[in-house]
UniProtKB/Swiss-Prot annotation:
One of its GO terms (molecular function) is toxin activity. Disulfide bonds join 54-69, 61-73, 68-77. The modification 4-hydroxyproline is found at residue 65. Residues 23-49 form a propeptide. This is Delta-conotoxin-like CVIE. Belongs to the conotoxin O1 superfamily. The keyword Disulfide bond applies. Coiled coil: none annotated.
């Protein structure tokens, strides 16, 4: 009996915690779909295509291809 009551209290607490810490989801889908549609029309607008902290062509990279934006490294980014 005590275990059942504790389980009920735990589930209620976790449910309340989920609602309290969740982002404001009002109009979430309404704002999500136009943004996704824009990225489908213009793939360059996608945030996934952007690499931050990479070196452009002509920069020294040693032998680490991950440092170059093009991921082609022969001592210098190509």
């Amino acid at each position: 009996m005590k275990l059942t009551c504790m389980m009920i209290v735990a589930v209620l607490f976790l449910t309340a915690w989920t609602f309290v810490t969740a982002d404001d989801s009002r109009n979430g889908l309404k704002n999500l779909f136009p943004k996704a549609r824009h990225e489908m029309k213009n793939p360059e607008a996608s945030k996934l295509n952007k690499r931050y902290g990479c070196s452009n062509a002509g920069a020294f990279c040693g032998i680490h291809p991950g440092l170059c934006c093009s991921e082609l490294c022969l001592v210098w980014c190509t």
